[in-house]
């Protein structure tokens, strides 16, 4: 690949063929080069030598961009134009500036496929929602529907199952499998979580350290796949976390969160209705529910990001909302990561500056940290195994590496309350276990409280003490 972009090229020449009838999973660690391989397949980057040859028969079009569709699930609302801020989803006065779902879906030439997709993903109930109001899982359903309606010859999907509830994941497996049987569609899945490989996949291509491995059958891959250790975090790092000194600005209240008969509406749609919820100091909550059930909306109230909280009976860290406290007085107690946060951080800053922005809860770094604060940033980057990325620009990192940087940002000020909304999105199996280890160790410290959202039961750390399940409608 183009030699003036060394970070965007494979270290060795790529030999790869997608033969008729094949469906491939590309697997590898975060930062291994999986996305670079996709960019090579799609023709995004010019090559140093040779060329990518295409034969899209029986499609009448010969153009790669018409036959190959690539969905990169990056938790974004539309294009990355820099105009999005992560609280925007909760501000009703911004809604008129964003389109409705129905305005963005193309006309379908195959009415049967359209009906199947609409039923599978519940698109009918989304049609009159503003695109910015879609939850992370709903956004994935919209993106999948939009792309599949265009009848691609080759469909490339980057981690398509993350963010989807278990029922929808199973249905998507089935739908893709059926489409590969009754149409000429061929599928390439880019997977960080290699145990997400569906049964219709025929071959696997491992990618490691920007080297494309040999294509092998799924059965061959499953036979040689190595298990991940039950614990990744070293004893030395575990002790460092447990021995962290406590800061002097701790809250002194038994109840961290108190919600009394809280209801949230957007237009005619009720997201939360008469919700009572108390989170006590030291509790570790798992928050779950189907896509679109209101999980992220609930967290936006706790994080002081949702303006509707002022009209509700909500007490955070012992102070009732609307009693004169600033949002920054609330946020200083909270470490937070979410799909919306990831979307807002598509900024070309050094990774360590992204981590440092967590000290002041800003999107971007507007105040240079003190030396001891920068040392804390480097400390947490080392804990998450990304110390070598500190000077790399954020946009040069893979999606999984970006997520690790944002996790370091959430922990950097040693918060009393951790709010982790699908924190393991896009992480490979090794890094998932590492992050789980860090979370469990951190939460063993006195009076540390956590709220975590995930659609994968196995992602929940062993320290979870309480469960809240939200039902849609």
Task: Report the location of each language-model feature.
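The feature captures the beta-strand-to-loop junction immediately N-terminal to the Walker
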Residues: 27-29, 288-290
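ABC ATPase nucleotide-binding domain signature region
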Residues: 38-109, 299-363
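Conserved ABC ATPase "signature" region
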Residues: 109-126, 356, 371-389
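Conserved ABC ATPase signature
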Residues: 130-134, 138, 367-369, 393-397, ...
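Hydrophobic anchor residue at the start of the ABC signature
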Residues: 143-144, 407
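Catalytic Walker B motif of ABC-type/P-loop ATPase nucleotide-binding domains
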Residues: 155-159, 418-422
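Conserved beta-strand-loop-alpha-helix hinge in the C-terminal portion
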Residues: 199, 209-237, 462, 470-473
């Amino acid at each position: 690949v183009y030699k003036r972009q060394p970070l965007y090229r494979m270290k060795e020449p790529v030999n790869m063929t997608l033969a008729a009838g094949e469906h491939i999973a590309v697997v590898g660690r975060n930062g291994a080069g999986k996305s670079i391989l996709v960019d090579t397949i799609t023709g995004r980057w010019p090559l140093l030598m040779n060329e990518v040859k295409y034969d899209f028969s029986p499609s009448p079009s010969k153009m790669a961009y018409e036959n190959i569709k690539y969905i990169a699930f990056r938790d974004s609302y539309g294009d990355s134009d820099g105009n999005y801020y992560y609280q925007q989803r909760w501000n009703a006065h911004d809604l008129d500036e964003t389109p409705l779902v129905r305005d963005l879906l193309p006309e379908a030439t195959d009415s049967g496929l359209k009906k199947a997709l609409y039923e599978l993903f519940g698109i009918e109930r989304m049609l009159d929602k503003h695109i910015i109001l879609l939850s992370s899982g709903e956004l994935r359903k919209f993106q999948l529907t939009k792309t599949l309606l265009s009848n691609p010859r080759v469909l490339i999907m980057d981690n398509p199952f993350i963010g989807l509830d278990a029922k929808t994941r199973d249905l998507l497996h089935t739908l893709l499998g059926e489409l590969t049987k009754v149409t000429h569609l061929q599928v390439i899945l880019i997977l960080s979580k290699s145990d997400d490989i569906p049964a219709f996949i025929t071959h696997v291509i491992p990618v490691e350290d920007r080297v494309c491995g040999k294509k092998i059958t799924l059965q061959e891959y499953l036979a040689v796949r190595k298990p991940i250790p039950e614990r990744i975090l070293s004893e030395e790092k575990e002790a460092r976390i447990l021995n962290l000194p406590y800061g002097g600005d701790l809250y002194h209240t038994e109840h961290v969160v108190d919600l009394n008969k809280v209801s949230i509406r957007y237009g005619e749609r009720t997201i939360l209705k008469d919700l009572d919820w108390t989170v006590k100091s030291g509790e570790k909550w798992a928050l779950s529910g189907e896509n679109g059930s209101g999980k992220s909306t609930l967290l936006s109230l706790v994080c002081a990001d949702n303006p509707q909280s002022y009209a509700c009976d909500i007490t955070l860290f012992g102070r009732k909302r609307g009693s004169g406290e600033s949002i920054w007085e609330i946020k200083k107690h909270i470490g937070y990561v979410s799909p919306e946060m990831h979307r807002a951080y598509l900024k070309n800053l050094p990774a360590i500056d992204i981590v440092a922005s967590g000290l002041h809860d800003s999107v971007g770094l507007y105040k240079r940290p003190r030396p001891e604060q920068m040392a804390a940033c480097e400390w947490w980057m080392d804990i998450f195994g990304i110390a070598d990325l500190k000077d790399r620009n954020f946009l040069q990192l893979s999606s999984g590496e970006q997520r690790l940087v944002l996790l370091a940002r959430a922990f950097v000020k040693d918060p009393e309350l951790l709010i982790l909304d699908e924190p393991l999105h896009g992480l490979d199996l090794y890094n998932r276990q590492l992050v789980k280890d860090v979370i469990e160790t951190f939460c063993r410290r006195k009076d540390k409280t956590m709220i975590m959202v995930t659609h994968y039961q196995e992602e929940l750390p062993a320290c979870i003490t309480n469960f809240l399940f939200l039902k849609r409608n």
